[in-house]
Design a protein with these regions (language model features):
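Phosphate/NTP-binding elements of NTP-utilizing enzymes
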Residues: 1-166
Length: 166
């Protein structure tokens, strides 16, 4: 008899309003899906929508709802991997057709529009950054004042425990 898997819902954790949320659990129950939607893409789009309604779009506003997608190893932040990570986000629906995918250029995440007819992608709004913990020295001294959240994905690895440094 197969046990029914309950899809993960981040709403109860969000209600706690904690500065740091550590989420771990069984594989394939929707943790990443919930986090990338509710803590990465949606907050940016909701703020943008509020700014447009208040006629504050343009250089007169600062969008601080951007995020950093953090992984342990630089191999985990290739453009292909990151774009595949966001492939299940229905960007077209969320942006009312303005964009249809999320792309990476120089480790910056963008809402983008892919044109099937031409095979070309046009970058739009910058929504975040992607970084690897193993290359943190490259980011020291950088300014990320527009970042509100850091999403550290897959922080627990099977078999590759980081040994204690002494």
């Amino acid at each position: 008899m197969r046990i029914k898997q309950i899809p993960y819902n981040i709403d109860n954790i969000s209600k706690e309003k904690a500065d740091i949320n550590l989420i771990f659990g069984e594989k394939s129950n929707g943790k990443s899906y919930q986090v990338k939607h509710k803590k990465a893409v949606l907050p940016y789009l909701e703020l943008l929508d509020r700014l447009e309604k208040d006629k504050l779009v343009g250089d007169s506003y600062r969008n601080d709802e951007r995020f950093i997608l953090l992984r342990r190893w630089k191999e985990d932040i290739s453009n292909l991997w990151v774009e595949q990570y966001f492939a299940d986000v229905d960007v077209e629906k969320l942006t009312n057709g303005k964009y249809n995918c999320i792309t990476v250029y120089r480790k910056v995440l963008y809402l983008s529009k892919y044109e099937v007819e031409t095979g070309k992608t046009t970058r739009g709004d910058k929504i975040g950054y992607v970084m690897a913990l193993s290359t943190e020295q490259h980011y020291s001294g950088g300014s990320y004042l527009d970042v509100k959240r850091i999403i550290f994905e897959e922080f627990m690895e099977r078999g590759n425990y980081v040994k204690r440094c002494t």
